[in-house]
């Protein structure tokens, strides 16, 4: 939001200015600055809906039961009642409870979600022949289509340019950025391998450790309450001094 223009220097021009560091080209980003004129305020907001582009196709409940029956016949020589989902041995006791009640889980429903993304930007600027200024604050809130993958960013930017006299100008730009990311995200691999009859949460509301009981495949959501939120803060400041030399068309500029 605070970028005014982007330009690319290539070949000899980049090497002449930046030396060996510019041998592969240089990208120059010009941030916005104040302009002469009356003080004015600008507010922009963007709202968007985000959802997973594509889900992974997995077996449905009936396909899962047929698979367990085939595995029971081929691997354990099961037959008759042993292959019955309710009285047999092809699924665990906890899965039988859900099977009897007709309760199934699409584990990707817990991993993925549809979210609203918000981006707010507020800026003001103004100035006169001697002084120009600009300041802005923006806030981005992106909950993330994967559970716990939320990202929040607050950006505060300010710049001021001062023309001291006909041959000297100075300026200062500052920026503060605060970023916050979510905690532990679900394990998608564990989600797509789970039984559709596996238990999602126990009677206390806690995530069930191993939904299939007989497998060491953990609940993909079991770690999402872990305190793994991360915060990053950056502060940047740079200034410049522009000196017009007593030679027509020649000036000296120092940035720091």
Model-predicted regions and their roles:
Residues 41-43, 133-135, 170-172, 250-254:
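Transmembrane beta-strands of outer-membrane beta-barrel proteins
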Residues 1-10:
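Short acidic/polar hinge/loop motifs at secondary-structure boundaries
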Residues 37, 129-130, 166, 246-248:
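Short coil turns and loop connectors of transmembrane beta-barrels in diderm outer membranes
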Residues 3, 156-158, 254:
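Extended, hydrophobic alpha-helical segments in both membrane/secreted and soluble proteins
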Residues 228-232, 236-256:
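Charge-patterned, long linear interaction tracts outside catalytic cores
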Residues 10-99, 166-190:
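N-terminal, post-signal-peptide soluble/periplasmic segments
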């Amino acid at each position: 939001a605070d970028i005014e223009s982007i330009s690319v220097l290539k070949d000899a021009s980049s090497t002449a200015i930046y030396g060996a560091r510019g041998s592969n080209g240089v990208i120059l980003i010009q941030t916005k600055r104040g302009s002469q004129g009356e003080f004015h305020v600008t507010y922009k907001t963007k709202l968007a809906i985000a959802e997973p582009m594509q889900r992974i196709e997995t077996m449905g409940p009936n396909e899962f039961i047929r698979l367990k029956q085939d595995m029971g016949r081929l691997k354990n020589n099961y037959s008759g009642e042993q292959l019955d989902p309710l009285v047999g041995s092809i699924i665990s006791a906890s899965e039988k409870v859900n099977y009897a009640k007709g309760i199934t889980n699409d584990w990707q429903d817990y991993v993925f979600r549809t979210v609203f993304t918000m981006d707010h930007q507020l800026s003001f600027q103004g100035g006169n022949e001697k002084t120009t200024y600009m300041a802005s604050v923006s806030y981005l809130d992106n909950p993330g289509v994967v559970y716990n993958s939320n990202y929040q960013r607050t950006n505060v930017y300010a710049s001021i340019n001062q023309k001291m006299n006909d041959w000297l100008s100075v300026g200062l730009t500052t920026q503060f950025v605060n970023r916050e990311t979510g905690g532990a995200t679900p394990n998608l691999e564990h989600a797509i391998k789970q039984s559709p009859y596996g238990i999602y949460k126990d009677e206390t509301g806690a995530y069930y450790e191993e939904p299939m009981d007989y497998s060491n495949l953990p609940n993909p959501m079991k770690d999402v309450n872990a305190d793994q939120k991360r915060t990053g803060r950056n502060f940047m400041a740079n200034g410049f001094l522009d000196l017009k030399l007593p030679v027509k068309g020649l000036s000296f500029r120092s940035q720091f």
